[in-house]
């Protein structure tokens, strides 16, 4: 269920519904508003440059507001202590006005943070499964849940666009149209199903030169096996292997962060990473033990398109 550009689902439903409002925002950006209003018929005062501090303050305030927003569930908020969304997105360099593509958003944990931040000044595109696809597919179930969520909270999600990914081809949008591509804890899935090259190729194509590819991933011990079965069973990838694969696709590692590190994670569990919260694959067995460990140790990597 991966591949061609398809604006069905959320994109077709919401972008049609809100097209007029979106057009106004494009034609009259907020930055030009002072030029449209004179004072007593006189010339508008000269525009002042926006400082780096103002820009940072703006995105900081938007992230804080999004994290506290009603579009997020209490269950999602409880995971902030492990996923550090504000710090992670700031590390990736999220800014007002960006076009951001999120690959494989699941049921929208990060989407619920990104959508309000980019709603008025920017664009968010989510690329995932087809809500009208095989009902037995996990991708279809996630896409249906995400679409339902979007329709229930249009105040946050009305301008999100969607791309359906299918096996026939991969496209995340027009070439060099995105400032940032993000994905969270998905790399092991691509290794397992053999789509890593397709995903990275699509990310490279949609990004502008100098654009950012930001990702988090469950981190295996250095030198751990990277064959599809081992990775699929464990859910972990060694950091050095991820960097090597991504750089071979034309990106350069610009920086890495330990904001999502967890030294308590021993990475040797009966059900792989899913033994840990929030999944607790073993149910009540040793629940307190795994709860005390917390969520997985994760690499947080920022690449740039050369």
Predicted regions and their residues:
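Class I SAM-dependent methyltransferase Rossmann-like catalytic core
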Residues: 62-91, 95
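C-terminal motif of bacterial Sec signal peptides marking the signal peptidase cleavage site
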Residues: 34-38
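Bacterial signal peptide processing site
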Residues: 40-42
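A short SAM/SAH-binding and catalytic strip from SAM-dependent methyltransferases
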Residues: 178-197
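A short acidic, Gly/Pro-enriched loop at the edge of an enzyme's catalytic core
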Residues: 157, 171-181
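Conserved beta-strand signature within the Rossmann-like core of class I S-adenosyl-L-methionine
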Residues: 125-127, 210-218
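Conserved class I S-adenosyl-L-methionine
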Residues: 97-106
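A short glycine-rich, Lys/Arg-flanked "PGG" loop and its adjoining helix->strand segment in the class I
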Residues: 115-116, 196-209
């Amino acid at each position: 269920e991966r591949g061609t550009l398809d604006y069905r689902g959320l994109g077709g439903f919401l972008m049609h519904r809100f097209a007029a409002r979106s057009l106004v925002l494009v034609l009259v950006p907020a930055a030009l508003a002072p030029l449209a209003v004179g004072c007593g018929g006189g010339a508008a005062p000269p525009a002042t440059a926006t400082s780096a501090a103002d820009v940072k303050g703006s995105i900081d305030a938007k992230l804080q507001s999004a994290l506290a927003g009603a579009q997020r569930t209490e269950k999602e908020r409880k995971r902030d202590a492990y996923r550090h969304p504000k710090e992670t997105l700031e590390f990736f360099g999220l800014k007002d006005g960006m076009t951001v593509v999120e690959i494989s958003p699941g049921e929208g944990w990060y989407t619920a943070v990104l959508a309000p931040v980019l709603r008025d000044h920017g664009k968010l595109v989510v690329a995932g499964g087809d809500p009208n696809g095989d009902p037995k597919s996990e991708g279809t179930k996630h896409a249906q849940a995400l679409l339902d969520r979007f329709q229930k909270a249009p105040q946050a999600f009305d301008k999100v666009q969607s791309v359906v990914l299918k096996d026939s081809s991969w496209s995340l949008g027009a070439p060099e149209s995105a400032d940032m591509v993000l994905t969270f804890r998905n790399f092991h899935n691509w290794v397992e199903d053999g789509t890593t090259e397709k995903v990275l190729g699509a990310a490279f194509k949609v990004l502008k030169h100098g654009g950012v590819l930001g990702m988090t991933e469950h981190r295996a011990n250095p030198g751990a096996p990277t064959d599809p079965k081992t990775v699929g069973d464990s859910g972990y990838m060694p950091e050095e292997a991820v960097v090597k694969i991504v750089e071979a696709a034309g990106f350069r590692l610009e920086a890495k962060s330990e904001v999502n590190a967890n030294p308590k994670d021993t990475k040797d569990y009966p059900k792989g990473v899913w033994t840990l919260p929030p999944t607790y694959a073993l149910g009540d067995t040793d629940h307190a033990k795994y709860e005390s460990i917390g969520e997985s140790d994760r690499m947080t990597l920022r690449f740039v398109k050369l």
